[in-house]
Amino acid sequence: MPQQSQLWLIRHAPVGGPPGMIPGIDAHADVSDAAALLRLREQLPARHAAISSPARRARETAVALGLLVSSDPAFGEQDFGDWTGRTHEEIRRGSEAVYDEFWRAPASNRPPGGESFVEQIARVRGVIEALPSGDVIIVAHAGTIRATLALALELSPERALRFAIDPLSLTRLGRLDNAWRSGRGGSS
């Protein structure tokens, strides 16, 4: 009997702070948009497993959606190391050469003290491949969702970085054994 899975990938609610800031693990989610949360909740399957990033913003979003989640560090955002908690403007002002070098190859380059997007994909790979069959809701980050898309759609890391993943957006992926397909919201 083939193994079927549906992944329901949700990006956490918006985070406060200055525009362009790279939030830390303890940044709060703004879960005040009750209408958006309700629209999203109505699209989710009733029976499911649910997992979130350990970041506060992902856990707060899961609670606001009424999900009982376990937390898995593999679903955490890309580690931006020394750049976490700072705006892009501050980072560039502090070290323009390092910042510019990072953006020449953002998929493979590492921020100082952090991890590359390629390394994030490797981190996500193990947990995605081990997910149970059935519906699995994952509340995570734009980078985590892009990493999952890279794996499922067999995209290069550079191409996966082209996806825009908005706060409170839903990305759906289906898997039959090891074959993936993509979808947007709704039910299958």
Predicted segments, located by residue:
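Active-site-proximal alpha-helix that buttresses catalytic centers in soluble enzyme cores
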Residues: 2-70, 94
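Short, active-site-adjacent cap segments at secondary-structure transitions
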Residues: 16, 57-59, 77, 144-147
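Phosphate-handling substructures
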Residues: 28, 65-123, 184
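Generic structural signal for well-ordered alpha-helical scaffold segments
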Residues: 38-42, 121, 125-133
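Short beta-strand scaffold positions
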Residues: 52-53, 122, 139-140
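Domain-level recognition of soluble alpha/beta enzyme cores
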Residues: 156-181
